């Protein structure tokens, strides 16, 4: 890979031959003109000034014409060179995204989101930085070749001396290439690890906040950042070692040429004009030589980035697309023939499964969490290929079928209802983008989502936000069901399609499903007894093995495991009584229950960043000392660089014109000493800048991440999560890059400008006025450039965040995109965002290409003016030839820093936009404050006082005037239709959000007065969105209490019924879990979440649909454990299944954000209202007479 990455990149560049030819052609023509200009200068000095026998006007016209041509050619070179860089970056990004869309299940399990983000952002930026200079490479090489040819024509001895250092420079460059490539690759790997930590913390932010683990996640980031810090310091040291050395060697060659050329001019071997022309050529070549040396460093970093990007592009699915189309039969059969499968070799998840579903038949597959149901569904849709055996659809092996024809026949309702950014209508029509509004409404009506949609101001055009998390779990699930029904599949695969809806809605959905599956084959993977009414036959899975298949009655009679799964488990009651007497978390003197209370490591806390109106500026003030030292060294380095022109003037006027060779030798020796001193100072400056930059980056990233962790959940809605990831990664790096390089360039440029102006005034003040005539034009051009580019950079930065958000979204929802054959539409969406970012980049490049060459044009015009007037003064004896030559050299140096300042403005704009975003983030108010009340043990009284709440993305309020008082120790179950506000109440108690109006009080205190971390340390929460962080199963359970012993972890798992599932996993409690739990089923994740909440022994327990993914037997165990826990603490439960409501102290019924009923179970049944209807539906759905279940007319 590494040997051919340059060839691969050149292939991408060659896709844009027109731009390449224009850029190279302009570079070639511009180089020829630049190399010939010193010859014009030689003629002017020898013939028009020194000899005084030729007019200056014709030469001035030639110089002005050359300046105009150079401006146009430089514009073309810069514009098309930058355009190539943006086009190739876009092509690489699109190819990487296309590779992502092709991934099968194994590739999706292999790649982390952190790797994806870094390789498509940071690594691509490294490649783009090199591609910007593609035309410059040719220009520099041509400049060197033509320059050497011109110098050889001027003087062979001097030319030989000038090229003596080329082999030395080549050897040093070769060594730097080898070391920098390895160091940069290592640093990029660590950067991917940091991004992975950030992305995981943002994706799992609800879990982080639920258990008050913000500091723990910050510790993770700090540890990953420390490893990155060490790797980046190695890169900085190598850059400091090789960069100044490669730039110093050409300068030493200049001093050697100065000494030899001056001696030859003094001896009459060459003319003063030839000497000045040779020096001008050498000066012209010094810049390309230094640039090429610097580009070697950039090239090694770009190579490391290119290798990583190309690895992503080259990733291929492990399964091979078939060649045969699926048969066009109206009904399809599904058959598993002795199927075995394992995610890891030699660790089977399914063992010898033989199961057939006849065409037109509905089969229900039941089993406990981790039994293999979801894996079976993945094999049917061919996310994976079987290890042994075969899966056949319509009698054809799925491995022989084209994926397009296979997936076009299948409709999938997954256990996790993944939605995409866009509107409700677009998500329903995800599998049929050509669907009419009437067809979308019909599917929504079938999924019982239409009533909710009609209450929204924008109806089906309402945006759902990233991953649809602004909707309730039931609403997302019904949209996913409508999406599958609109697809009109011949084979319908549903994985618990009604687990998050209430009983009344489930009855209606079942009636519709009964009609929908009447003329098609269907497989229902379910844990709910009510769904079995739709099935013709039932299959029972247990630990990856098929136990029984038959009609529901037959299996009920002969399969004990089936009866156990669908019935409560009374034999566990005694264990629960023991558990009640032996709590998992025994109080220990001086020991808290959260990780934050046990760590001795100081990390950035909620108030570590300095307060005030501009926290970013205050934070950067911590590094004033190192930054000042770095800038002081830069100033010394710059001053040393201003001495050579003065030494050259002395050497010409005294050493050459007056034949005082000792003056020439002293000038050359002083120049050499100056170059060496400059090299040492430059090395020190690079070391200090490198160390300081990495320290600032480490500190800034940690503080921004710690602050982001403490923001309210509303900051993570819409695309806020992607913007936060961008802020912690790309934005902090943009700021530090400017501090490390841009600020250095600014200091160099300012010091150079001041020093040159002083020198020019000292040589001849009158000529300075000629230079100042160009300044008003330059100031006007700079103002216009800044005004136009500022808007472009801001838009481009925001668009980059959108590109990253789209990548994260499709990486998370790839299986749904593939199941509904939406890869091409995903590619179109990503292309639109990426192309918009590219066009903004090209627009910015056009502005740069117009502005920077204009500065050089003004420099050339000023040089011509000074040359004309200076020649007249030389003839008049006012100034010497040496003084005029020095003046011309200084003019070249004068406009160089002006151009670099203008170029630095590009980095400044990027940093300014990034700083604005980070400043805005750091200024966002967090729920906690330094004056917050500390929280000890809570009694648990909860009061809602006239509480209203509205989500930012919705006009309809989620809660409207809630007044409730929940005494300490009471168990309250909230019921109602999906979207009625139940989960929002739980989130307000957890203080994920603050009420829009009204107050939530606990133990008589407004939650806004509590220390938010201390308060959440007293809670145990199970949210709808299950998330676990990468690590072992044991780590996942102990997330809220990392100090728990293995025995305590196991006891918590036993009490919620998770222990059998865990021991069935490979390595049991040490089983490795991927970020987000992608290698676990929804039921397994829910059991881990319950054990996690149980372990912390909370004062207030909050359960939001905590058992929707569990089978009845496991659910019964969990409910008994919940009631045992609830006996000692306040417990608030959101439930669609009403089994636990019967045993609760109190039931609160919500509809449309208001309380419509409140009372005990028997009271509400007697009232005959909302709860009575819900209970009647629930009773019918959960009747033990499974074969005779009937849904009531809701």
UniProtKB/Swiss-Prot annotation:
GO terms for cellular component: plasma membrane. Disulfide bonds: none annotated. Its EC number is 7.6.2.-. It comes from the Bacteria. ATP binds at residues 367-374, 976-983. GO terms for molecular function: ABC-type oligopeptide transporter activity; ATP binding; ATP hydrolysis activity. Residues 21-301, 628-910 form the ABC transmembrane type-1 domain. The keyword Nucleotide-binding applies. GO terms for biological process: response to antibiotic. The chain crosses the membrane at residues 20-40, 56-76, 130-150, 153-173, 258-278, 279-299, 628-648, 660-680, 743-763, 765-785, 847-867, 878-898. It is a multi-pass membrane protein. It is found in: Cell inner membrane. It is an enzyme of class 7 (translocase). InterPro entries: AAA+_ATPase, ABC1_TM_dom, ABC1_TM_sf, ABC_transporter-like_ATP-bd, ABC_transporter-like_CS, P-loop_NTPase, Type_1_exporter. Residues 334-568, 942-1177 form the ABC transporter domain. Keywords: Antibiotic resistance, ATP-binding, Cell inner membrane, Cell membrane, Membrane, Nucleotide-binding, Repeat, Translocase, Transmembrane, Transmembrane helix, Transport. Its main location: membrane. It holds the Pfam family ABC_tran. The keyword Cell membrane applies. Belongs to the ABC transporter superfamily. Lipid exporter (TC 3.A.1.106) family. Overexpression increases resistance to chloramphenicol, ampicillin, streptomycin, tetracyclin and vancomycin. The ATP-binding domains (NBD) and the transmembrane domains (TMD) are fused. This is Multidrug efflux ATP-binding/permease protein BCG_0231.
């Amino acid at each position: 890979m590494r040997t051919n990455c340059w060839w691969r990149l050149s292939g991408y560049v060659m896709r844009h031959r027109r731009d390449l030819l224009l850029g190279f052609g302009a570079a070639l023509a511009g180089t020829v003109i630049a190399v010939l200009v010193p010859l014009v200068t030689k003629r002017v000095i020898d013939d028009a000034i020194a000899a005084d026998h030729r007019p200056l006007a014709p030469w001035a016209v030639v110089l002005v014409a050359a300046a105009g041509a150079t401006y146009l050619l430089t514009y073309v070179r810069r514009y098309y060179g930058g355009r190539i860089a943006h086009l190739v970056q876009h092509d690489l990004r699109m190819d990487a995204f296309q590779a992502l869309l092709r991934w099968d299940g194994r590739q999706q399990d292999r790649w982390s989101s952190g790797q994806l983000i870094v390789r498509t952002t940071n690594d691509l930026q490294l490649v783009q930085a090199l591609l910007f200079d593609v035309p410059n490479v040719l220009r520099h090489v041509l400049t060197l070749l033509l320059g050497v040819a011109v110098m050889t024509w001027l003087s062979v001895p001097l030319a030989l001396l000038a090229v003596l250092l080329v082999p030395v420079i080549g050897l040093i460059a070769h060594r730097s290439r080898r070391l920098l490539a390895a160091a940069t690759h290592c640093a990029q790997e660590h950067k991917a690890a940091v991004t992975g930590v950030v992305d995981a913390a943002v994706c799992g932010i609800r879990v982080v906040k639920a258990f008050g683990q913000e500091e723990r996640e910050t510790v993770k980031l700090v540890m990953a950042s420390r490893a990155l810090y060490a790797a980046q310091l190695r890169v900085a040291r190598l850059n400091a070692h090789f960069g100044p050395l490669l730039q110093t060697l050409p300068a030493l060659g200049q001093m050697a040429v100065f000494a030899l050329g001056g001696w030859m001019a003094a001896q009459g071997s060459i003319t003063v004009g030839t000497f000045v022309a040779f020096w001008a050529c050498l000066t012209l070549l010094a810049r390309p030589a230094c640039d090429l040396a610097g580009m070697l460093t950039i090239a090694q970093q770009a190579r490391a980035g290119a290798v990583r990007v190309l690895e992503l592009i080259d990733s291929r699915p492990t399964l091979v697309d078939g060649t045969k189309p699926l048969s066009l039969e109206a009904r399809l059969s599904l058959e598993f023939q002795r199927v075995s499968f394992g995610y890891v070799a030699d660790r089977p998840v399914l063992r010898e499964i033989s199961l057939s579903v006849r065409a037109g038949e509905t089969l229900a597959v039941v089993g406990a969490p981790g039994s293999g149901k979801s894996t079976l569904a993945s094999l049917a849709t061919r996310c994976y290929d079987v290890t042994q055996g075969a899966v056949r659809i319509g009698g054809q092996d799925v491995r022989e079928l084209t994926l397009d024809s296979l997936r076009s026949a299948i409709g999938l309702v997954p256990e996790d209802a993944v939605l995409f950014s866009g509107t409700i209508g677009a998500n329903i029509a995800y599998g049929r983008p050509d669907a009419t509004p009437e067809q979308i409404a019909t599917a929504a009506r079938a999924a019982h989502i239409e009533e909710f949609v009609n209450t929204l101001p924008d109806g089906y055009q309402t945006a759902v936000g990233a991953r649809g998390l602004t909707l309730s779990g039931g609403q997302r699930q019904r949209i996913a069901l409508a999406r599958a029904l609109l697809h009109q599949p011949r084979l319908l695969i549903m994985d618990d399609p009604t687990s998050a809806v209430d009983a009344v809605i489930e009855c209606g959905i079942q009636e519709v499903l009964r009609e929908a599956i009447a003329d098609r084959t269907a497989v229902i993977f379910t844990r709910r007894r009510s769904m079995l009414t739709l099935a013709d036959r039932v299959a029972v899975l247990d630990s990856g093995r098929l136990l029984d298949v038959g009609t529901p009655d037959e299996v009920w009679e002969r399969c004990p495991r089936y009866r156990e799964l669908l019935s409560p488990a009374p034999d566990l009651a005694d264990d629960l009584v023991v558990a009640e007497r032996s709590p998992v978390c025994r109080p220990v003197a001086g020991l808290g229950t959260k990780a934050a209370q046990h760590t001795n490591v100081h990390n950035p806390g909620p108030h570590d960043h300095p307060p005030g109106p501009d926290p970013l500026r205050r934070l950067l003030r911590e590094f004033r000392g190192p930054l000042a030292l770095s800038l002081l060294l830069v100033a010394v380095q710059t001053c040393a660089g201003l001495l050579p022109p003065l030494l050259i003037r002395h050497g010409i006027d005294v050493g050459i014109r007056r034949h005082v060779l000792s003056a020439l030798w002293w000038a050359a020796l002083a120049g050499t000493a100056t170059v060496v001193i400059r090299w040492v100072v430059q090395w020190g400056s690079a070391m200090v800048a490198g160390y300081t930059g990495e320290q600032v980056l480490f500190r800034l990233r940690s503080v921004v991440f710690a602050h982001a962790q403490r923001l309210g959940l509303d900051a993570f809605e819409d695309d806020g999560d992607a913007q936060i990831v961008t802020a912690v990664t790309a934005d902090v790096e943009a700021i530090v890059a400017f501090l490390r390089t841009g600020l250095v360039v600014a200091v160099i440029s300012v010091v150079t400008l001041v020093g040159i102006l002083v020198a020019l005034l000292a040589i001849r003040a009158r000529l300075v006025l000629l230079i100042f005539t160009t300044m008003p034009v330059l100031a006007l051009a700079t103002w216009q450039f800044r005004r136009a580019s500022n808007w472009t950079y801001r838009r481009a930065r925001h668009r980059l965040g959108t590109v990253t958000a789209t990548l994260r979204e499709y990486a998370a929802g790839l299986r749904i995109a593939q199941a509904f054959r939406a890869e091409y539409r995903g590619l179109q969406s990503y292309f639109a965002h990426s192309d918009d970012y590219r066009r903004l980049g090209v627009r910015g490049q056009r502005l740069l290409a117009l502005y920077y060459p204009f500065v050089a044009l003004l420099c050339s015009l000023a040089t011509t003016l000074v040359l004309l007037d200076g020649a007249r003064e030389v003839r008049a004896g006012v100034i010497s030839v040496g003084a005029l030559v020095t003046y011309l050299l200084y003019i070249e140096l004068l406009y160089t820093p002006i151009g670099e300042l203008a170029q630095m403005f590009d980095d400044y704009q990027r940093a300014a936009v990034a700083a604005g975003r980070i400043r805005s983030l750091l200024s966002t108010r967090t729920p906690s404050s330094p004056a917050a009340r500390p929280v000890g043990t809570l009694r648990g009284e909860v009061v809602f006082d006239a509480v209203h709440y509205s989500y930012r993305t919705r006009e309809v309020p989620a809660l409207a005037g809630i007044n409730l008082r929940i005494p300490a120790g009471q168990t309250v179950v909230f019921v109602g239709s999906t979207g009625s506000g139940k989960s929002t109440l739980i989130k307000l108690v957890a203080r994920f959000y603050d009420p829009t109006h009204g107050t939530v009080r606990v133990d008589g205190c407004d939650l806004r007065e509590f220390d938010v971390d201390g308060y959440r340390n007293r809670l145990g929460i199970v949210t709808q969105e299950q998330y676990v962080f990468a690590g072992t199963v044991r780590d996942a359970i102990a997330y809220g209490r990392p100090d728990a012993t293995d025995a305590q972890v196991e006891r918590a798992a036993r009490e919620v019924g998770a222990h059998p599932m865990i021991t069935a996993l490979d390595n049991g409690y040490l089983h490795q879990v991927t970020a987000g739990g992608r290698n676990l089923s929804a039921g397994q994740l829910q059991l881990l979440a319950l054990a996690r909440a149980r372990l912390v022994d909370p004062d207030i327990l909050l359960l939001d649909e905590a058992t929707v993914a569990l089978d009845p037997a496991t659910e019964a165990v969990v409910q008994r454990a919940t009631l045992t826990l609830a006996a000692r603490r306040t417990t608030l439960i959101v439930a669609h299944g009403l089994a636990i409501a019967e045993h609760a102290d109190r039931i609160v019924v919500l509809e449309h954000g208001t309380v419509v009923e409140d009372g005990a179970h028997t009271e509400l049944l007697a009232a005959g209202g909302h709860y009575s209807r819900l209970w009647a539906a629930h009773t019918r759905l959960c009747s033990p007479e499974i074969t005779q279940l009937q849904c009531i007319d809701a």
